[in-house]
Swiss-Prot record:
Coiled coil: 1044-1073
Residue numbers carrying Cysteine sulfenic acid (-SOH): C634, C859
Binding site for (E)-cinnamaldehyde: C415, C422, C622, C642, C666, K712
Positions marked as site (Key residue for activation by the scorpion wasabi receptor toxin): P623
Tissue: Expressed in inner ear (at protein level). Specifically expressed in a subset of nociceptive neurons. Expressed in the same neurons that TRPV1. In contrast, it is not expressed in neurons expressing TRPM8. Expressed in the superior cervical ganglion of vagus nerve. Expressed in the inferior ganglion (nodose ganglion) of vagus nerve. Expressed in dorsal root ganglia neurons.
Pfam families xrefs: Ank_2, Ank_3, Ion_trans
Binding site for Ca(2+): E791, Q794, N808, E811
UniProt name for this protein: Transient receptor potential cation channel subfamily A member 1
Organism: Mus musculus
Post-translational modification: TRPA1 activation by electrophiles occurs though covalent modification of specific cysteine residues in the N-terminal cytoplasmic domain. Hydroxylation is required for TRPA1 activity inhibition in normoxia. In hypoxia, the decrease in oxygen concentration diminishes the activity of the hydroxylase EGLN1, thus relieving TRPA1 from inhibition and ultimately leading to channel activation.
Gene3D superfamilies hit by this protein: Ankyrin repeat-containing domain
Annotated site, Crucial for calcium permeation, chain positions: D918
Length: 1125
């Protein structure tokens, strides 16, 4: 039996067959090798040509094709038969990387025999590739009519199969104008009534593609099937567009004529209410318009038909300057004065789009010039703001009386054409309008003159022309509806040259209705050049106040203009408070204007700025306090300036750093300055307390703050704390001696220790140690009484806050139990009560002593950690108690025969002990098991295993994990906690110390020698254990070299800019003298970068001028989109 090929899978898989071997070549093999190698025993000549074509094979390999694809594309029918006979039927429809089957490849290469053979073998003709194209679509696209015929004759072929965008093969045939293929498809049952994704029928595609032969076949076939030509040619798609609309879009005159001859309705409208005529008018297709108008037989006025925007054909032609078309439309009766939905006539629309041929044509034809759009503008309003202005019109038109009368016509806002020309800055239009004796004092509804507009938009040449012939300064100083003069508007927008011109012409420094001067407006925008012009002219205007008491400094600070603030300070502007008691520095801080604050800090008037505030203002406090709250990074910079290193080398012994504390000394300095009548009380260490309040760790860790606290500690803190600790030890040490010297349980009184035996009930008085014991008892008693007095005084001082501190409750317990312990000195009390109180007293005495030590840095941080870990334990008490109850009661039920578990209370205590690791497995569980004392051994050991897993493993690890996490958190914020305690200690001490003493020990600065020891050997040893351990920080290295270089480059650029401006003015003068006409004469836009930026911000605002400006800058070109077929 003849062996065939084994099943062929995807390329790049090895196929082994008897007689035929197909090897896919991997990517790692040399590209010079054959991509595919087919060895066939016998019949080698038949495949010789196929194997030799390496270039094609390489291409096929890249496209991931299999041998059947190659054979189908090359027309190798015998090889295809050989491959198919040795494989399964699936190989017929195998796809390559693009989704193409062998039938696709055969159709694409116009291999008719391959197509026939594949179809005869059962290939599926309805499979589509990635581009949604079937073999029939590919054949139609390539115009392979024989292949089309073969495919359509096959019974399995779906002739109406949809491809990309829902297009059938019939539609693709119309796009190619292949009438022969169309005839074949129609004969085989292709549907003309099937539409694509956009609702287009084949008749639409034929009209758009200009396929006249296909169109004739389609109409004839439709007529044969009951659709008249007129009905068929007026089919519409989803957009209600007819074939005539699409034919006009393509611009094919013959197709349009064919559509009209077959009854296409010219007055049919699509969704946008546009007829095909409107499309043609937009394109400027005069021949098409003439054809359609001459072919129209309806009763309506087709020439003046309007679209959805109420625009006629003449509007469309005027918009795009189609002069010939407009002239033809006028000749056939087009209404030259019709208006669209926005009230625009063709004349206004042509003027707005700079279609000057149309404008002059319409004026010649007698178009009305007094028609206004919905904004009240006539055509002259739009003409004057175009480049070259009125020069675009013929000279004879400007002599017409009805056009001259328009120069004073106002729009809805009361603006005349002169206002428009001044706003846009067209000197030619301004000169022409002034030549008609137009009044420059005309006002708009918001009381703005043309000079207001020119000044607002920086039109320097226009301002010069307007001010050229004035005899008084009334125009210069007139205010608009808001009281703003041209000087205000020019300063507000940063036009320094205009400001300089206005000031030279006599403009006054007036205030608007809000009390704002020109300097207020310039400072609000941060225009330093404009501010300099104003300040150089009138220096006294720096201190002018508005209605809220704000100066120009307030405005510049609020908007964050640091350079403007620096300039005003350099011009010695007064630092004043507004009506809200806020200086410019308060406003900058509240608005978080970092650059403004940093600029003020670096200014030489910083100390003056710092002192301007009121002590009784709740929201505008001392600027230092506000800086800590709102801008801590600026406070850090200020503290950096308080560190002044010496000029010596850092490794030298004489190298020192001076720490200035003047910005941390608010309490003392303010106490001296606050008037006695003002009820203002400042807390000691106010600045540091504000840092603690707002959690400013980086500021508290700053070297200046650390040195400040160290100075306080050395001045009085260490002494006071040691005195407090010493007074506490007066009770602690005697109490400790009493507990150590006297045997617990023995009674004692003032006479001595009473030694008694429980067997004989005899008592013996020990008088040998009676005197020292008596002294210790008296000291404990007196220290406790002293403690009582101290606590009572603190209650009156701290009031409610006293009861919020748990340390105070602890001291009451200590003093009470201590007095009870030594009460036998005066009264006889039972010994058991005496020693129980003694145990409590000595415990809390030493625990409270531990809290005293947390004031010291080296050991205090560990005490804080111990406190945090204890709080973590308390948070887990809920879980802890429930586990204790669960296992304790369970063990009571199972092990109640043992003494340790005999009662529920004892069982709970024993379980608690087991939680700490004292499980006692042998005595409690193992030996009772061997003695058969366990009533429920399995349950008992199961409970033991559960206890071991939950408590020693899970619960303890949980507590350890929480403790480790809290320790890491405490270490992270250890600095803040330690310094906060130091600040609290010094604050409380300064509240109690007299002012004269504080003035004596307080220092405004200190000098530290980092390379020298600060204390003697004994003191260093003592400070190592108890005192603050300084971690010196380097002085911030502020390298100003880069800043200086940048500043030099800045000044060089300013010099170059000034030089270029002078050269520009010189060139302009030369051009004027030589009477050279240049397009630049019409440009009136001399703006700096900041001026242009401000102008862009203004133009982005919602305004009625926006679409006019856009039309002036660029002429819009209409691009009509058509559907993709």
């Amino acid at each position: 039996m003849k062996r065939g090929l084994r099943r062929i899978l995807l390329p790049e898989e090895r196929k082994e067959v008897q007689g035929v071997v197909y090897r896919g070549v991997g990517e790692d093999m040399d590209c010079s090798k054959e991509s595919f190698k087919v060895d066939i025993e016998g019949d080698m000549c038949r495949l010789e040509d196929f194997i030799k074509n390496r270039r094609k094979l390489s291409k096929y390999e890249d496209e991931n094709l299999c041998p059947l694809h190659h054979a189908a594309a090359e027309g190798q029918v015998e090889l295809m038969e050989l491959i198919i006979n040795g494989s399964s039927c699936e190989v017929l429809n195998i796809m390559d990387g693009y989704g193409n089957t062998p039938l696709h490849c055969a159709a694409e290469k116009n291999q008719v025999e391959s197509v026939k053979f594949l179809l005869s073998q059962g290939a599926n003709p309805n499979l589509r590739n990635r581009n949604m194209m079937s073999p029939l679509h590919i054949a139609v696209h390539g115009m392979y009519n024989e292949v089309i015929k073969v495919l359509t004759e096959h019974k399995a072929t779906n002739i109406n199969l949809e491809g990309e965008n829902g297009n059938t093969a019939l539609m693709s045939t119309c796009a190619k104008d292949n009438s022969e293929a169309l005839q074949i498809l129609l004969e085989k049952g292709a549907k003309l009534c099937k539409s694509n994704k956009w609702g287009d029928y084949p008749v639409h595609q034929a009209a758009f593609s200009g396929a006249k032969k296909c169109m004739e076949l389609i109409l004839a076939y439709g007529e044969k099937n009951g659709y008249s030509r007129e009905t068929h040619i007026n089919f519409v798609n989803h957009k209600k567009a007819s074939p005539l609309h699409l034919a006009v879009q393509s611009g094919d005159l013959d197709m349009i004529k064919m559509c009209l001859d077959n009854g296409a309705h010219i007055d049919m409208m699509e969704n946008a209410k546009c007829m095909a005529l409107h499309f043609a008018a937009t394109q400027g297709a005069t021949d098409i318009v003439k054809l359609m108008i001459s072919s129209y037989t309806g009763s309506s006025d087709i020439v003046n038909a309007v679209d959805g925007n109420q625009e006629t054909l003449l509007h469309r032609a005027s918009l795009f300057d189609h002069h010939d078309l407009a002239e033809y439309l006028i000749s056939v009766g087009a209404d030259i004065n019709s208006t669209d939905s926005e009230g625009r006539s063709p004349l206004i629309l042509a003027t707005a789009s700079a279609s000057w041929n149309i404008v002059n044509l319409l004026l010649c034809k007698g178009a009305k010039v007094d028609i206004k759009d919905h904004l009240g503008r006539n055509f002259l309003h739009l003409t004057v703001q175009q480049p070259y202005g009125l020069r675009n019109l013929r000279p004879e038109f400007m002599q017409m009386q009805h056009i001259k009368e328009l120069v004073m016509d106002e729009d809805n806002d009361g603006c005349t054409p002169l206002h428009y020309a001044c706003r846009q800055g067209v000197p030619v239009s301004v000169n022409n309008l002034l030549g008609f004796n137009v009044s420059i004092h005309s006002k708009s509804k918001d009381k703005k003159s043309p000079l207001h507009f020119a000044a607002s938009y920086g039109r320097i040449n226009t301002c010069q022309r307007l001010l050229q012939d004035i005899s008084d300064t009334r125009l210069l100083n007139e205010g608009d509806l808001h009281g703003m003069t041209p000087l205000h508007l020019a300063a507000k927008n940063g036009h320094d040259k205009v400001v300089q011109l206005l000031l030279k012409k006599g403009a006054l420094f007036l205030s608007d209705h809000n009390g704002w001067t020109a300097l207020h407006h310039a400072s609000m925008g941060g225009y330093t050049q404009t501010m300099k012009v104003i300040l150089d002219t009138n220096l006294k205007c720096t201190d002018r106040l508005d209605e809220e008491g704000n100066t120009a400094l307030h405005f510049a600070a609020r908007e964050g203009h640091a350079k403007a603030v620096a300039m005003l300070l350099s011009y010695n502007a007064d630092i004043l408070l507004n009506k809200k008691q806020a200086s410019f520095l308060h406003i900058a801080l509240h608005n978080k204007r970092k650059e403004v604050v940093l600029t003020t800090i670096r200014n030489k008037r910083w100390d003056e700025c710092l002192q301007v505030f009121t002590h009784n203002s709740p929201s505008n406090r001392c600027p230092i306090m506000e800086m800590v709250e709102y801008l801590p990074e600026c406070m850090k910079v200020l503290l950096d300036f308080c560190m002044i290193p010496s000029t010596e080398d850092k490794s030298c012994q004489d190298y020192h750093i001076e720490y200035n504390f003047k910005y941390l000394q608010c309490p003392l300095s303010m106490t001296k300055k606050v008037a006695p009548t003002q009820d203002v009380v400042y807390e000691p260490l106010t600045i540091l307390n504000v840092m603690v309040q707002h959690n400013r760790i980086e500021l508290l860790n700053h070297p200046v703050c650390r040195e400040y606290l160290l100075m306080k500690w050395c001045a009085y803190g260490f002494r006071a704390h040691m005195m407090n600790l010493g007074s506490y030890c007066l009770g602690l040490i005697p109490m400790t001696l009493l507990v150590v010297k006297i045997q617990p349980g023995m009674a004692f009184n003032s006479t001595g220790i009473i030694n008694g035996t429980s067997s004989t009930h005899e008592e013996r008085i020990d008088t040998l140690n009676s005197f020292p014991i008596k002294i210790c008892m008296i000291l404990v008693f007196l220290s406790s009484i002293f403690g009582y007095c101290k606590e009572v005084i603190q209650i009156f001082q701290q009031k409610r806050n006293y009861f919020l501190d748990y340390n105070n409750a602890l001291e009451w317990v200590i003093y009470t139990t201590s007095i009870i312990f030594v009460l036998p000195l005066f009264l006889n009390i039972p010994a058991y009560m005496q020693w129980q109180c003694g145990a409590i007293a000595i415990f809390f005495y030493w625990m409270n002593f531990l809290l005293y030590l947390q004031r010291f840095e080296n050991c205090g941080i560990f005490i804080v950690m111990l406190e945090v870990i204890f709080k973590t334990l308390l948070r887990s008490t809920g879980v802890f108690i429930f586990l204790l109850l669960a296992f304790g009661l369970s063990f009571y039920v199972l092990l109640n025969f043992q003494d340790a578990f005999s009662t529920p209370l004892l069982s709970l205590i024993q379980t608690f002990s087991m939680m700490l690791g004292d499980i006692n497995y042998r005595d409690a569980f193992l030996e009772p098991l061997f003695r058969n004392e366990l009533a429920y051994p399995v349950l008992t050991f199961g409970q033991l295993i559960a206890f071991t897993m939950f408590v020693p493993i899970v619960l303890m690890n949980l507590l350890i994990g929480l403790a480790v996490g809290d320790i890491a958190e405490v270490q992270k914020h250890a600095s803040l906690k330690r310094i906060a305690m130091q600040v609290e200690l010094h604050t409380n001490l300064e509240k109690k110390l007299p002012l004269w003493y504080l003035r004596k020990v307080d220092q405004r600065s200190t000098i530290v020698y980092p390379n020298r020891p600060r204390h003697g050997r004994m003191l260093r040893f003592f400070h190592y254990f108890l005192n603050m351990q300084e971690t010196r920080q380097e002085v911030p290295n502020i390298d100003t070299c880069l800043e200086m270089e940048i500043l030099k480059q800045k000044y060089r650029l300013k010099d170059l800019t000034s030089l270029l401006e002078k050269q520009h003015e010189l060139i302009k003068l030369i051009i004027q003298k030589m009477e050279i006409i240049s397009e630049t004469e019409d440009e009136d836009n001399h703006c700096s970068f900041q001026d242009r930026f401000k102008k862009e911000r203004l133009e982005q605002m919602h305004s009625k001028w926006n679409f006019v400006l856009n039309a002036v800058k660029t002429k819009t070109h209409c691009s009509i989109s058509h559907p993709d077929f």
